[in-house]
Amino acid sequence: MPRLKTVLGSLGLAALLLAPPLSAEDGGRWLERMAQAVKEQSYHGSYVYERTGMFTTQDIWRQVDTSGSRERLLQTAGRHQEWLRHDGRLVCTTSSDLKRSRSPGRSSAPLIDSQQLADVYSMKVYGETRIATRPVTVVAVQPRDGFRYAHELYIDNETGLMLKSLLVDDKRELLERFQFAAISFDAPDYQAGLEPSSVCQEVIITDIPAATDVSFLEPAWLPPGFSLSHRDVQTMRDSEALITSQVYSDGLASFTLFIEPLVGDSLAEDLRAQLGPTVAVSRRMVTADSLFLATVVGEVPPRTAERIAESLEQTMAEAAR
């Protein structure tokens, strides 16, 4: 499918982005508020997600209290799709392939350190507008290098929750749009839809034996500002093979490195694919006694993902010495 060619100017945003900032206020403070709201805010809303000319609409219910967080997503058009998460862990879905997992680290919303973020992004506040009838502040986040994309964030003035985001490449092509059409912070609204439907399949999480030998492969190169935020070990349905995943983030952008063992006659090949902002780069890796597939998936430019994947060969060479 052809890439969406819409540029920021045709979205009516050119004047906003090209004009000087309306405020000298540090955009980093708004990003810190946004990160805090992701962890603490309860709400119910309906939003539109767009990438590469394709649209999906979803409802979300999210409740955060002293016992943790619960979140349910429901696709409202097309095939029924549903996801339920407790404390960030997927516990129910209509398309589950997971069989079991062991998590050496706890997944959580990224902590945004505005000073560290300023090393790799420039952040500017560009005034106010409205999203879903609510006043929001617009923060433009521009990368200082070519290893990540630009963001335009519309942050709710009252709660700090992000109500709209645009992801833009270095040619100012729109890669992704996320936008709430309606949102409520009233308890009866967000509590009403937290129970899964009858077709939502439980994701069975059982412990992989602690004695199981699990090796995580670290890339020899990471883009500046990225660091490891989470590790996990999984097996897929009808397979006992262990698949490791490692999530890296710079506070805004993130990518995941998957390592999957292969058998000798596996048809898996090197590949590069992209859908909107999401890129996937796979490399077959061979050691003296094993064969596996390393895949980098994330919302980073293709050249970034390729360099990360290529650096794994250096990691393996150093380990073999």
Where are the regions a protein language model picked out?
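Gly/Pro-enriched, hydrophobic low-complexity segments
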Residues: A132-S198, R272-L275
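Short, hydrophobic/aromatic-rich segments at coil-to-beta transitions
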Residues: E40-S46, S67-R72, T133-A140, L161-K164, ...
